[in-house]
Structures are given as structure tokens and as C-alpha cells.
Amino acid sequence: MVFSVRQCGHVGRTEEVLLTFKIFLVIICLHVVLVTSLEEDTDNSSLSPPPAKLSVVSFAPSSNGTPEVETTSLNDVTLSLLPSNETEKTKITIVKTFNASGVKPQRNICNLSSICNDSAFFRGEIMFQYDKESTVPQNQHITNGTLTGVLSLSELKRSELNKTLQTLSETYFIMCATAEAQSTLNCTFTIKLNNTMNACAVIAALERVKIRPMEHCCCSVRIPCPSSPEELEKLQCDLQDPIVCLADHPRGPPFSSSQSIPVVPRATVLSQVPKATSFAEPPDYSPVTHNVPSPIGEIQPLSPQPSAPIASSPAIDMPPQSETISSPMPQTHVSGTPPPVKASFSSPTVSAPANVNTTSAPPVQTDIVNTSSISDLENQVLQMEKALSLGSLEPNLAGEMINQVSRLLHSPPDMLAPLAQRLLKVVDDIGLQLNFSNTTISLTSPSLALAVIRVNASSFNTTTFVAQDPANLQVSLETQAPENSIGTITLPSSLMNNLPAHDMELASRVQFNFFETPALFQDPSLENLSLISYVISSSVANLTVRNLTRNVTVTLKHINPSQDELTVRCVFWDLGRNGGRGGWSDNGCSVKDRRLNETICTCSHLTSFGVLLDLSRTSVLPAQMMALTFITYIGCGLSSIFLSVTLVTYIAFEKIRRDYPSKILIQLCAALLLLNLVFLLDSWIALYKMQGLCISVAVFLHYFLLVSFTWMGLEAFHMYLALVKVFNTYIRKYILKFCIVGWGVPAVVVTIILTISPDNYGLGSYGKFPNGSPDDFCWINNNAVFYITVVGYFCVIFLLNVSMFIVVLVQLCRIKKKKQLGAQRKTSIQDLRSIAGLTFLLGITWGFAFFAWGPVNVTFMYLFAIFNTLQGFFIFIFYCVAKENVRKQWRRYLCCGKLRLAENSDWSKTATNGLKKQTVNQGVSSSSNSLQSSSNSTNSTTLLVNNDCSVHASGNGNASTERNGVSFSVQNGDVCLHDFTGKQHMFNEKEDSCNGKGRMALRRTSKRGSLHFIEQM
């Protein structure tokens, strides 16, 4: 009550009392609130007696996966003491989140099961009691003697507890308080376990400990929900009833790093319960059985131990269980004194399941994911490789390995990269060696799924592998892809139609793999590219399946919706890239359809002539490949026509085919003609999808390509003999030996390849037309064969031809410099004509293939396609149209009227029509300006005359003339090389030849008894 005594506002004594009372009430309320808050804070941790020294040890996973230890000593802290006695040494702290009114605080409630996905949090306490005067704790078996005497007894206890929790959990947080007076160590810990990890394993490892599942936690609306045990320590969480294992459950003390991990038999998982896993009591001494609505499979632990009964307890809220049969991870021996047995896959003792449709590998946490070094990862991979080397693999052990690989996929990328290829091989080998009785089997884990189906190669049906729900990965084999899948791969029914007979017997199973994370597929060479989908793969009994009559279709959902303006590529993992480390390649893969959330891929190729020497063996854009294809086929068609004309000309007219260069040219034209014809027929024959016919066409294409290369090299070798070995050189059956090399060596190479494996050749798709139809082509399928027998073979020929080309050019320059003043000089056009003709004759233009790389790839592909497909056309121009003696033969026999030449018009002349009569016999005698050469094997000369005509005299006195430096004799066919390849010795001759003075040179030919007069070019 307030009284106003005065108007001036003075307050009476009663008013002062009331004001004081109000202030006192406010202080009491604040005190109550503060005390309540302190009580709730103290309930969140395990506290030791007042005189105790409290040590808080926090383990947080560091960046490299190794727990970092932080120790804080708290002195003179008043804490509530956990009641303890000699008989009961372990208590569970119940963390309360209810206020004084009994109502749960209505703040942001986090459902941990929705956060953890495949894990669960547990809270537990344990109290160790030890004898202060003993160097070894009473209830522990210390096998690592190095710790004794170095650490204090409490530190030793804490160290062993740390190792146990580190081994059994994904992550954990621990806080310990030491009571020296009572010789006790009280520890409270929060651990994160995999949702299929049996919590009794922790109870077995930690003697007399109780574990409580954590479910709901309340936190401030400004704070995100927790994801680690450290964050949970700061919050108020509900604890469910403790998990109780029966009294006769195998117990064991905490163990050191040298001991094996104590694990108990798995509890039965009832998949009928959609969101809960119940711990039921399995029968003693029996394999653990996972009950599913469909046929049941029995799975036996690796080292069978008497199964302890597990009492029922409230269900743990976990993600929905797969309707597949689960198998446990490797379990080591558990007893009161556990022997040092290592958990490995090398010596499994597993019983085969009686009826198995699909098997799901549960993600049991028995190994450390965040290892301290790459050596730990390598040891785990090595254990799996050793187990696979033993042969057949049972489903439960295979499931354990799949789960092990799944956990390793979450290791740091820099540590995982060196082992990526080995892990991929482990996954493939698991599918190859998996032993199962039914038609199909599947193994799933959080990040990896594998499915294997038994097939009959002769009656294979269209099969679709489907992966669904990345949060709870499930796979299935369907006849068609569902709409809600995250990845599918469809194999056509014609998948194995083109397999060889011996491979048909091996193709008894098809394996599918799905990787939820691309950890094993890191390509450092990618620039401005990133993987936006999951990874899916398929293989047929580890065989190389090519020659598909229908494409394989792959549909992959994007992890994040892609932007419309970005370019999406379909790629595959090429194990040969990046020095054998593997890398992404889009060779042969194209986008069939692109949507906002998914991409449909298919594989095919377009074929251009450049694919024969495409060193990178990669494809370009469809529009460019279409243009290259048109250029290729038009060029090959023109070359075939003009090569045929060249062959008919040189074969029909005897006078122009007598010399060696002409005979070699005939062989080269024949090889190029056959190469172009087979290439033109290849794509047409590929449409029939006949394996034997396709292999035959590919073999002939390869053979004629090598023959063409070889005759180009023989052209260069012939020029070398003419320039360097002019004198004292005689080769018996010269052209016959050239033919044996030119046609025989490629035949040997192709025969060796066929002997090794005919499957090195076959049908392949090398691109796609803009309308989506594939362009199939019969060619070399094996990259090693291609690079050795095509690229390597061509490199040798190309280097020889380039060297010879340079030598010829240098020699021509020297000849021109030696000419006397006033002598007739060639024009620049003539020089360019000679160089161009030599370029196409020696196949120098094939060298464009070496520059078809990087940003100039397309440019050189165009140059390659234009010049090499038209090689036959250019040979016709330079060696038929540009040669006057060939033109005269055409005019004589093919023309009529004024264009027709008379029989002997300006072609064949005797030695008296401009030259003094002279006798040519065995040997040649000349004046002091002449050059004579003789040997035991040959005694013939060739006379080169710098004139517009030439006279060739044989032993019988017959002679012939020609222009442009190509000469031949009438009877024996002895010839010289083309004039631009001759090594000439000039001398003056005071005789007229064809109305002019000439300079003459002598050169030896390969036979006896003939003298040739050839004009200077």
C-alpha cells in the first residue's frame, strides 16, 4: 500500500518497505533461475569428488584423420560425486533436459536420426578403480609393457579407454575425472557409431559399462543441429533406456593397440520394422540370421564364438533397413583374455548361404576411417587383395569387403589417390570371385553397391541395373529403368553376339558397380571440368566387349541441377590415362539426351580417314566429323579413279614402265588403290554386323595400309642407292627383292597379330552422325596393337622418307650450282613441281597426323584428310599428266585427228640422227673427258646428255629418246633413276645431238651391255 503524505513527492516508510520487498523478490527469482541453470549444467557431465583433480581429455578428429588430444586440469572445483562402491564400479549418468516443472524446454529440437543418416550417438559412463601401490591396474590385462612405468595409473587407464573408443567408433568425445583418494577414474563419453554397429561390442570392450542411445537434443534456434560428439556435449539431450547385455555376455578389458578389436556376435536385424532395429536374442552357437520377408540366407561369422543372448531393449531410431540379407564385418575373437588375433580377410571360415537372392553388406564400423597415414590404408587394401587371391569368395566376406571399400572412400583424397586403381580392381575382383547359388546377388553399403547376375551368353536378355536413394543406397536389376532412379545402365540383348567362341564360355556373369562418391575417380588433368553425377559401371566377366550392334545406354542423375548454358559431356574412366593412374575421357561417348536433372549417354564414333592415324584416338565435334567424313570419302573416291588410270597407263605402255622407278611406282599405286577401295567398303560391310566378315575387312585394311607405308619407304631407299651407291652397285633380281619386302613384311606383321588374337580386329563405333545414328567401322580395337603396328611402323618409314627427301633436295641444289655458265637452268616452277611430286611420292603428307593434337587438332585433321585421301590424284598429276613421254603415249594411242602422233614421231631415233655413229659393246671407252667404270659383275654405263632429247643405245644398236629425264632401253629393260635423283659427272662432248651441243655424263646401271643417253633435267 502506498500513501502520499505530501504533495512534494516524499515517500513514506511504508512505501520504502514495499519497494525493498519487491527488490528482494526479484533477487530471489533471479537466484532460483541461476541455481536451476547450474543444476542442469552439472547434469551434462560426469563429476568427481571435491578433493579430486579433474582432467578433461577431448578427442576431436583432425584434418588428417588422427584424433587430436587436448588435456585440461581443473583444480579446486566443487563437483557432485558419483556414488560408487567396491562391487559396483560403473554408473550411467542420466542427462536430464526437463525443467523444474517437469516440462521439456520448447526450444529447437534436433532429431539425431535425421541428422546422422547412417550413424547413431550414444552416451555412457565408466569408472575404473585401481590399486595405487600396483604398477598394473587390477581389472586390466596390459600386453603392451612399454606403457607401464611411463604413464601414471590413471593416465594408463585413460589411454586404454581412448584406444578402445577410437577403434570402435567413428568419432567420440571423452571427459574423465580422477579421484585420487578413492583410486578411481570416472569417465563420461559420447560416441558416434554406425547404425548397424552392435553397441554390445562397446560394452564387451569396456568392462561393466552401460550405453544409452541419444535421440532428441534441444538447442538454441540460432545454433544448427549438432553433427559431432563435441557439439552434443554443449547441448541438453534425451537419453533412452540403457542397452543391457546379459550377464554371461563375453566381457573383456580395454585393449592396447597391439591387441585385436573385441567384437561380439551381431544382433538379429528385423527388416520388417521400417525404422527401427531391435536387438533380439539369437540362439547360442548358431550363425547370425537376418530375417527378411523373402528367402532367408544364413551367414556365419568368420570365427564362430558362442553367441551370448542379447536382451530386448527399446528400438533405436535408424534409417529404413534394406529388404536384403545383411552380413557382418570380420569379427575377431572375444574372451576374458583375448588372444592377439588380427582382424583380416586372409583366413575366412564362412559357410555358403543356402538360398540367397540379394545380399546387403551392412556398414559395420570395425576399422578406423580416419587413419593416420597412407600406410594404414594400404594395409587394409593389402588384406583384401590377399583374401581375393585365395579364390572363391562367400557372400558374407564379399559384403564385408564392399563395406570396407565404402568406408575407405571417405578417406582424405590425397591419401586415397595412390590406391585408387587397386581399390577399383578389388571391387571388380569381388564380383568375379563371388560365389552364389541363385541367379542374382547384390551387395550394398553407404557409398558403394555391387550387383552380379548369372547369364547365358547365347540367350542374353536386355538388362537394366538401377540404383536408387543415395541416402539409403539400394540397387536392383530390372527389365526397364524406373523414373525415380539416380543411375541406370541398360545392356542390349545383342551385348554378346560378337564375342568369340572362347569368350562366350567365360561370359557367365555380368557385374554392375555404383559409386555414390567419386573418390576413386579424381583426374588432375581436368581443366574447367567437374563431375556432376554419380559413377556407374558394368563389365562382362572381365572381358573386353566391343563390336556392339546396339549401344549401351547410361542414365545418370545430376548431383546438383546443372545450368542450361553449361556444356555436359558423357565420359568414361580410361585406366591408361595419366601414366596409368586413370583419367576421364569422352572418346566414343556422346550425349543422347540432356535434361535439367539428368543426362542420357550413349557410345559411338564417326569414322574419318584420320582415324587410321589418329594418335590421340579421340573424337571431335559431330559437325566437324561430318565434314571430315565427306572429305574422306570424296578424296578416296577420286584417288581410286586416278590411281586406276595411272596403273593402266604404266602397265599398258611398255616403254614407260621399263625403268626401276616406274616399276616401284606401279607397286605403290596398286597398294594405295587397294587401301582406298577397302576403306570405302569398310563402313558398308560394317552394317551387316557379321563378326568374321568385319575382322577380315579390318585385317585387309591394316595390311594394305602397311603395304602403302612400305612401298613409300622403298621409294626412298631406291633414291638412296641411286645417290650414294651409284658406282659398283649391282643387285640381282632388284625388283623381285623389293616386292618381297614391300608385300611380305606387312603380311608377317598382320599374321602375328591374328595369331595372338583375332579379336584385336573387329567392329567399333567411332562417332555419331548429327541425326544420332552411329557410324560403325571395322578396324583395330586394341590400343597397343594400334600404336605399335600402325603408329610405330609409320614413324620408322616417315623418318626414313623425310631424311631421303632432305638429301634429294640438297643434291639437286648441288647439281644446279655445278652447271656451267650459260647452261639451261630450271625455272622455279619446275623446282616446285619436282619437290611437290617427291612429297606425295614419299608420303610426307602423312606426317600431319603427328600435329593433330591440342588446339590445332581440327586444322591438321582437315589437312590430313585432304592431302592423304587425294594422294593418288596427286600422283596421277605429277607422274602422268606432267610427264611428256606419258602424254605422247596417250596422244599416239588414245587420240585421233590432229592430236594424234605418228608411230615414230619425235619418239624413237637412231644414233645417226644427230650423233656420230658409235659402237656400244661390253664396256665403254671414251676420250680424256669421259669417265669409264668397270667391275667384275657389271660393265655398263649410262650417258646423260643435257639436251631436249636423249638417245638410248643397247648392244644391238637400237636407241630411244625421251624428255623429262625418264629413260629406258629397248630390250633388256635396264634403266636409270629419275633425273632428279642422279649423281652426275659432267664432261664436254663435241658432238651434236638433236640440233645442239650437249654436255654428257656417265652413270652406271644395274646390268651389263647397255649405254643410255639421258638429257639433263
UniProtKB/Swiss-Prot annotation:
Extracellular compartment residues: 38-627, 689-693, 759-789, 856-857
Entry-linked Pfam families: 7tm_2 (PF00002), GPS (PF01825)
Keyword Transmembrane: yes
Coiled-coil zones: none
Keyword set includes Phosphoprotein: yes
PROSITE patterns assigned to the protein according to its UniProt record, in alphabetical order: G_PROTEIN_RECEP_F2_2, G_PROTEIN_RECEP_F2_4, GAIN_B
PTM summary: Proteolytically cleaved into 2 subunits, an extracellular subunit and a seven-transmembrane subunit.
InterPro entries linked: GAIN_B, GAIN_dom_sf, GPCR_2-like_7TM, GPCR_2_secretin-like, GPCR_2_secretin-like_CS, GPS
GO MF term set: G protein-coupled receptor activity
Binding-site list for 3beta-hydroxyandrost-5-en-17-one: 868
Highest taxon, organism lineage: Eukaryota
Name this protein carries in UniProt: Adhesion G-protein coupled receptor G2
Natural source organism: Homo sapiens
